[in-house]
Amino acid sequence: MPLHVYDTRTREKRPFKTARAGEVDMYVCGITPYSPSHLGHARCYIAFDLIHRWLEASGWTVNYVQNFTDIDDKIIAQANEEGIDFLEVAERNIVDYYTAMDALNVLRADHYPRVTEVVPEIIEMVSTLIEKEHAYVAEDGVWFSIASAPEKYGLLTGQSIDAVREGASGRVGDSGKKDHKDFALWKLSKPGEPSWDSPWGGGRPGWHIECSAMSLKHFGEQFDIHGGGHDLRFPHHEAEIFQSECCTGKSPLVRYWIHNGFVNIDGEKMSKSLGNFWTITEALVKYDALVLRHALLNAHYRSPIDLSEQLLDDAKGHHARLVAAYGHALVVVTQSQKAGVVNIPKLPQADIESSDFLASKLGLLEKLLTEAAIAMDDDFNSRQTLSKVMNGARLIPQILDSEHIDERDTAAFALYAVEWLEEFAGTVLGLLPEKDVAMAVHDPSLDPARKAVKDEVEQLLARRAIARSAKDWESADEIRDALAAMGVVVKDTPDGVIWSLD
């Protein structure tokens, strides 16, 4: 079955077809960097990383753009509270984001445009909307007129134009607009706020216009995929449809709208007021990054996911089994090569059928591989894919430890198992660690003096780096104390961290 993707706008799975054969233009709304990234961000960007990985594994060239909203009310408020420039707040939290995503094995997008870099393009787009009478100038800025294109209302959420509560359509102030459903395109700055010159006076962009301007700059008038969290469908993404389609006259703006589900904590929506709000840094102090990734991928990206300590502990056990299977196969290949087993046959191939046992088990793995690909082609179903991969991870050690196959066939199967796991658990799901780490999980005696300590220390240091980048000094100190208790001396230098055993 060819790839089918669920489109929020049409509310159905459709065969995936792009404007240009073999290429995908994908825009995903990025963070507003006023505070450290949290588990909701982890869910979102791991989901779109999965989509990115599968498209590339399927032969597509993906042109991936993800923005940073580096000017916003919350950033300004945080900067005022700290008495620093708003760009310092944004940059600090952008660094935190990159560090967290790297730890979670999220591949980088091709471009990360920032709002402050595209203000001229935003002003040009607002001017066009005014000229086409889709926007109007008021005493406090420029507003988009919903009444100028009522047919576009509710395209993603299905709600009626008359059903919107007052004030739902914009983050910035709402005085001066003609209709409560109108939203801000350009907001005149108050004294002391960041400001850019414009034909309507010094000010800054509204929330929604930025993404329309950035997608137009990078992809043109129409593109293939627009993604983001479920909460962005309204007002943000519906506002983008208004702005972009009214500006360019082209419809639809996007071929496929893709939205990921929410993250709940122990059955409740994650929120600071409920005290169940986790930053990624806080989560990685307690759980390995790939364990967290494993847990988040064990749900379809459109489904809500209820994170709990029980779920994360279960993911820890499942991920350990996966890594151990990978390590086991790697160890067998390495030991076979050292023992002089040469010309290890490349599976699958016809002459292996002389071993009925191996042929039957090989058939099971090939079937799982096919089923995993079918699941990914069914709207990127990572839950089903992960289930197939874990079935393989249970099967691989059983075959490698079997007495029914000889040394050469065992080596051949181990090599096939490594490639099998690397294809889906690694390239597609992004769940495999470095080879030496996996081998040590299976056989710690590979480096009895320092291997286990070295891996644990490096994992702790990586978590400490994340905490330090987010200025989470308490977590960083806790990790340093844990290292000290292990007899590890940590020294921070301009060239990086140096550690030694006391």
Regions found by a protein language model. Give the residues of each.
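Alpha-helical recognition segments enriched in aromatics with Gly/Pro capping
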Residues: 1-34, 49, 63, 120-332
